[in-house]
């Protein structure tokens, strides 16, 4: 059972990495980062089946950090959209004061 969970976790993490490396939309970038965090959560839960509840504690901590990261990231994306009119990161290469 743990092998299947780790395989699924690795596939989800790889999909997230490919999404982060290939996409330029900020919202898609955050979704891929959340997918990678959920893949790590899945592996923590799979390992906690063998070693007690330590993995579940880490999952709760990672979910808390992910929620804060998502809220802050979306606030930044909204501010970028209001200022530049787009969320495409390739258009934001020039930083002006």
UniProtKB/Swiss-Prot annotation:
InterPro entries for this protein: NADH_UbQ_OxRdtase_chain4L/K, NUOK/Mnh_C1-like
GO biological process: ATP synthesis coupled electron transport
Transmembrane segments: 1-21, 27-47, 58-78
Keyword Repressor listed: no
Cysteines joined through disulfide linkages: none
Keyword entries, A-Z: Cell inner membrane, Cell membrane, Membrane, NAD, Quinone, Translocase, Transmembrane, Transmembrane helix, Transport, Ubiquinone
Assembly information from the UniProt record: NDH-1 is composed of 14 different subunits. Subunits NuoA, H, J, K, L, M, N constitute the membrane sector of the complex.
Catalysed reactions, semicolon-separated: a quinone + NADH + 5 H(+)(in) = a quinol + NAD(+) + 4 H(+)(out)
Reported function: NDH-1 shuttles electrons from NADH, via FMN and iron-sulfur (Fe-S) centers, to quinones in the respiratory chain. The immediate electron acceptor for the enzyme in this species is believed to be ubiquinone. Couples the redox reaction to proton translocation (for every two electrons transferred, four hydrogen ions are translocated across the cytoplasmic membrane), and thus conserves the redox energy in a proton gradient.
Organism (species): Gemmatimonas aurantiaca (strain DSM 14586 / JCM 11422 / NBRC 100505 / T-27)
UniProt EC number: 7.1.1.-
Enzyme class: translocase
Gene Ontology molecular function terms on file: NADH:ubiquinone reductase (non-electrogenic) activity; quinone binding
Localization of this protein: Cell inner membrane
Gene name, Swiss-Prot/TrEMBL: nuoK
Topological category with respect to the lipid bilayer: Multi-pass membrane protein
Signal peptide, first to last residue: none
Main location per the UniProt record: membrane
A GO term from the CC aspect: NADH dehydrogenase complex
Family: Belongs to the complex I subunit 4L family.
This protein's name: NADH-quinone oxidoreductase subunit K
């Amino acid at each position: 059972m743990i092998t299947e969970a780790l395989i699924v976790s690795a596939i989800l993490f790889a999909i997230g990495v490919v999404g982060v490396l290939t996409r330029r939309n900020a919202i898609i970038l955050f979704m891929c980062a959340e997918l990678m965090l959920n893949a790590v959560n899945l592996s923590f839960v799979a390992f906690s089946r063998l070693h007690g509840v330590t993995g579940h504690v880490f999952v709760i901590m990672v979910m808390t950090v992910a929620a804060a990261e998502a809220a802050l990231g979306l606030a930044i994306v909204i501010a970028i959209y209001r200022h530049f009119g787009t969320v495409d990161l390739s258009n934001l290469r020039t930083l002006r004061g």
